[in-house]
Amino acid sequence: MLTGSVNVVLTDSDVDVEASFMSDFSIEYTDITYIELRNDLDYGKRVIGAANSKVLTGTFNNDEFGKYRLAVNKSVPECVVIHTADEVYVVNCDNSESTVRMYNELLTKITP
């Protein structure tokens, strides 16, 4: 199945994530403790959500984070890991260049 999409938008106050097969969510910049740009992440197993040949979306569980929210395009190796005090989110854009650009822009929004 080749359906699904992930859309990440950086607003003035938060990260908005719209992804197929899951509820949209937002992460306020003030809640973010740190972020990482990764290309070696083991996504683990799906708890609830979708896993097809195009996207992985929903709640997943892995050894590194335990239960976390995931919204990624499978064809893009880079992803941004967003840590808050209570949760971990992993997202990416539709290509590597856009994902790196989003990471760099997000860094400027969370750094005082």
Model-derived features with residue positions:
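Terminal and domain-flanking low-complexity segments
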Residues: 36-38, 74-112
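Alpha-helical transmembrane spans
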Residues: 1-6
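Non-transmembrane, membrane-adjacent beta-strand/coil modules in membrane-associated proteins
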Residues: 19-27, 33-85
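Juxtamembrane extracytosolic/periplasmic "stalk" immediately C-terminal to the first targeting helix
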Residues: 9-16
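Structural motif detector for alpha-helix initiation sites
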Residues: 12, 29-30
